[in-house]
Amino acid sequence: MVSVINTVDTSHEDMIHDAQMDYYGTRLATCSSDRSVKIFDVRNGGQILIADLRGHEGPVWQVAWAHPMYGNILASCSYDRKVIIWREENGTWEKSHEHAGHDSSVNSVCWAPHDYGLILACGSSDGAISLLTYTGEGQWEVKKINNAHTIGCNAVSWAPAVVPGSLIDHPSGQKPNYIKRFASGGCDNLIKLWKEEEDGQWKEEQKLEAHSDWVRDVAWAPSIGLPTSTIASCSQDGRVFIWTCDDASSNTWSPKLLHKFNDVVWHVSWSITANILAVSGGDNKVTLWKESVDGQWVCISDVNKGQGSVSASVTEGQQNEQ
């Protein structure tokens, strides 16, 4: 059973495209077609507007919080082809960096695991993915994967930081030898997996095909110490797939259809323990799904967006149309 614990009146003047809680769950960032990014303090069920950030010249599609070990940092991306990195200094939010290296709308931003440093992946309608790495003293290094997806890239999601050969931790005193990976989804109906080579260049490692229309979102599940890697994907075709890879050396991924919805599915998002998947669709509902003991995914609850109503949990084996 799911309950609505808080409703925030953002006072955005147009459609809200994204809302993200910070690491501690005390701040909420929102973005809208009104070209603004807003940050609210939502502690104790309240809502205090902390910042109204203006800098984009078009609809703002997505926001992403960096890990707090780097300070209070928020990234936003927009139809105006720009990525803006905002930073809070002495209680005031200001533009820290602006990336204008794309030729079309930037649709998705995602921070890498904090273990790698401050790295931001950005997916654009120009088909490219750019990776911004903070090098110190206000400087950002930019790498770009051109033609990552023909027609355009809609989503990027990093793999959790796991050391090869070690499921949970690395030997003390040794610097971990992380292999950086992320997934992307595009208008070519594909999910692609990317890996950083030893020379620092990014290489396409795998191509996952199952969707029959644009891939709208991808979400790499958090690691909980198991050797299995899991990715969720959703599409314009109304389908949500769960992709699993049990053997990193073979890099073989198997898709399982979670559900076929009657409308476009915009977003998928994992719980921090990777056992519940939230699915957001074009029919104004958010559904929550959990894997049962027999490996089937079942809907455990659904919430009508904007209305705060919650349905009863469905019994195992039932399928609930979103």
UniProtKB/Swiss-Prot annotation:
Keywords noted in UniProt: Acetylation, Cytoplasmic vesicle, Endoplasmic reticulum, ER-Golgi transport, Lysosome, Membrane, mRNA transport, Nuclear pore complex, Nucleus, Phosphoprotein, Protein transport, Repeat, Translocation, Transport, WD repeat
Notes on how activity is controlled: The GATOR2 complex is negatively regulated by the upstream amino acid sensors CASTOR1 and SESN2, which sequester the GATOR2 complex in absence of amino acids. In the presence of abundant amino acids, GATOR2 is released from CASTOR1 and SESN2 and activated.
Gene from which this protein is expressed: SEC13
GO molecular function: identical protein binding; structural molecule activity
Recorded family membership: Belongs to the WD repeat SEC13 family.
WD repeats: 11-50, 55-96, 101-144, 148-204, 210-253, 260-299
A GO CC term attached to the entry: GATOR2 complex
Subcellular location per the Swiss-Prot or TrEMBL entry: Cytoplasmic vesicle, COPII-coated vesicle membrane; Endoplasmic reticulum membrane; Nucleus, Nuclear pore complex; Lysosome membrane
Protein's name in the database: Protein SEC13 homolog
Keyword field contains Endoplasmic reticulum: yes
Keyword Transport applies: yes
Subunit structure: At the nuclear pore: component of the Y-shaped Nup107-160 subcomplex of the nuclear pore complex (NPC). The Nup107-160 subcomplex includes NUP160, NUP133, NUP107, NUP98, NUP85, NUP43, NUP37, SEH1 and SEC13. At the COPII coat complex: interacts with SEC31A and SEC31B. Interacts with SEC16A. Interacts with SEC16B. Component of the GATOR2 subcomplex, composed of MIOS, SEC13, SEH1L, WDR24 and WDR59. The GATOR2 complex interacts with CASTOR1 and CASTOR2; the interaction is negatively regulated by arginine.
Post-translational modification N-acetylvaline, affected residues: V2
GO biological process: cellular response to nutrient levels; COPII-coated vesicle budding; COPII-coated vesicle cargo loading; intracellular protein transport; mRNA transport; negative regulation of TORC1 signaling; nucleocytoplasmic transport; positive regulation of TOR signaling
Domain of life: Eukaryota
Physiological role: Functions as a component of the nuclear pore complex (NPC) and the COPII coat. At the endoplasmic reticulum, SEC13 is involved in the biogenesis of COPII-coated vesicles. Required for the exit of adipsin (CFD/ADN), an adipocyte-secreted protein from the endoplasmic reticulum. As a component of the GATOR2 complex, functions as an activator of the amino acid-sensing branch of the mTORC1 signaling pathway. The GATOR2 complex indirectly activates mTORC1 through the inhibition of the GATOR1 subcomplex. GATOR2 probably acts as an E3 ubiquitin-protein ligase toward GATOR1. In the presence of abundant amino acids, the GATOR2 complex mediates ubiquitination of the NPRL2 core component of the GATOR1 complex, leading to GATOR1 inactivation. In the absence of amino acids, GATOR2 is inhibited, activating the GATOR1 complex.
Positions bearing Phosphoserine: S184, S309
Membrane topology: Peripheral membrane protein
